[in-house]
Structures are given as C-alpha cells and as structure tokens.
C-alpha cells in the first residue's frame, strides 16, 4: 500500500473532497500493471487502509478491473510462524495469526493472471455498503466486552498535512518539518466490523484460527501502563484466548463461548477447520498442499 499520507490513496480515479483534487494511483490504462494488494487488520487501524476503497468522507470507490484487494482478517502487521504470543510492552498477548497460506495462493493466482489471463478470485475486503466497514467506536464495530480487555476504539487518524509549498502528491521537496496538520481538514478512517467473538467478519479468515476460532484476534493492542498506555502498541495486534471450560468462562464473566462449549469433542474443531479450508481451496484462495498442512496441524491440537 502507498504509505505516504497524501492523496491519492485508491487505484481508480476519484475526486478528493478534502482538497478538491482529482487523481489516482493507476491512471495509464494501456500500461498500468496487474495489482494484487493485501492488508492485515492492523493496516486498517494504523495505516488508514480503508482509504484504498473509499474517499475522504467514507463514500465507497470502485477498484479497477486490473486490481484485486484482500483483507487478511484479524491479523497484525507481521507474525512469525510458530512463535509463542507474548506481551512485551503491550497489554494483551501478541497476535500469532499468520496469513501466509493466503499469500501463497495469491502468488499462484498472479502468475496465472499474467501467463494465461485467468483472473484471480474476486477481491474480499470490508465495505460500508454491506455493513462490514465501520467507524472504530465499540457500538459500530460490535467488539464484545471481554474481562480485562480495554477497548478504546483508538485509530491512527489522518489529517491533511502541509509539507510546504514545494511538495505535492507527485513528490517534491519537504520544507515544513514536521509537517503541520491543516485545521478542519481530515480524512475519515474506517475499520473492519467484528463478529460476536471480536474477529473480523470480512476478508480472508484463516481456517484453523478464524474458521474454527480458538480466541479473539485483533489488529490492535494497547501499550501497558508506564509505556504511554493511551497509545496503540505499534504494529502488534492482540490475542485473547477463549476460556477452556464453561465454568471458567462463567466465573470470569466472559461473554464468548468456551472451547468446551464450541467443540464438545475434538472432532468438532477438526470438522469446522476442514470445511473452512475446503471452501477457500474451491475459490483458489488456498493451495491444496496448504489445506493438507492446515488439517494436519488441526489434527494435532488438543481442543478442548
């Protein structure tokens, strides 16, 4: 994603309501490349990813035919496969969800798009038009009230910034350092809506962690007290495991069903993982070899 916080943010041509300018990332149809862009949930909270698909006021934009865009649901910016969640300076455990299995399938899809003209699967991302892209407050997102989890609805805001007279969206020389926010000029930033467990509804949901969830995975985390606790915790998301039993859940006041309630026998978990993985494979969003790996890993898990 284009990270310089200046218009244009989206691939198709549009008019910016904040500046009145009309522009696009892609504007030379004869030579524009094929594009597959992915963003994690954290990119919505920290890097204004929603502006790829809507304008400054939240009005939905249409992506060009040569662009595909996918949300890697409920993932943080980067997670190391197999690494145990840890808190560091964050309040909650880090998010262990790794969406690499989807990236592998999309690389194959890009290769086919270029070599034989087979288009990739349709884009999958949250949209305001179907209620899956919303304001960051709790009422809008639907994030559950989980014991010992602070939800501030804090998002990295994006005011229009003045970089000095020699800098435009096309580049130039920054003469105003640090750049100054222009009063009364701000871009609306939206985030993915979540389900009753607190996991993103839209996008590509990893079968063994969201198709059959083991906890809540988010694209945001807060810093602990003593580490600027009012702020988001950098590029780290959150992992909030489900209680193992109904008794544990009831004792803590957790509204999310426990593992015991979700998966009375281990086969229930494996069946849900298998069904979810098969659906993605049919849509060419998972490779068969990764389906086998996911199912093998799920078989080895003790749930509940």
Could you tell me what each predicted segment is?
Residues 1-304:
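C-terminal His-loop and adjacent cap/lid subdomain of alpha/beta-hydrolase
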């Amino acid at each position: 994603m284009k990270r310089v916080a200046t218009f244009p943010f989206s691939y198709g041509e549009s008019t910016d309501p904040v500046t009145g300018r009309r522009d696009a990332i892609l504007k030379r149809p004869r030579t524009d490349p094929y594009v597959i862009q992915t963003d994690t949930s954290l990119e919505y909270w920290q890097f204004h990813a929603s502006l790829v698909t809507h304008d400054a006021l939240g009005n939905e934009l249409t992506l060009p035919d040569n662009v595909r865009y996918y949300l890697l649901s409920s993932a943080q910016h980067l997670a190391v496969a197999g690494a145990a969640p840890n808190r560091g300076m964050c309040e909650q455990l880090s998010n262990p969800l790794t969406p690499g299995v989807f990236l592998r399938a999309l690389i194959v899809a890009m290769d086919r798009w270029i070599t034989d003209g087979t288009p990739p699967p349709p884009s999958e991302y949250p949209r305001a038009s179907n209620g899956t892209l919303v304001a960051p407050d709790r009422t809008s997102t639907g994030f559950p009230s989980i014991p010992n989890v602070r939800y501030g609805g804090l998002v990295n805001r994006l005011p229009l910034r003045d970089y000095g007279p020699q800098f435009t969206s096309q580049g130039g020389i920054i003469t105003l350092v640090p750049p100054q926010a222009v009063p009364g000029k701000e871009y609306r930033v939206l985030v993915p809506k979540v389900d009753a467990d607190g996991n993103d509804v839209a996008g590509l949901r990893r079968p063994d962690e969201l198709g059959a969830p083991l906890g809540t995975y988010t694209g945001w985390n807060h810093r602990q007290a003593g580490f600027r606790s009012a702020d988001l915790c950098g590029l780290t998301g959150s992992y909030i495991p489900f209680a193992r039993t109904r008794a544990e859940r009831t004792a803590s006041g957790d509204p999310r069903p426990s593992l015991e309630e979700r998966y009375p026998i281990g086969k229930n978990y494996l069946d849900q993982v298998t069904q979810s993985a098969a659906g993605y494979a049919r849509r060419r969003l998972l490779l068969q070899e990764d389906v086998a790996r996911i199912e093998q890993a799920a078989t080895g898990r003790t749930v509940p």
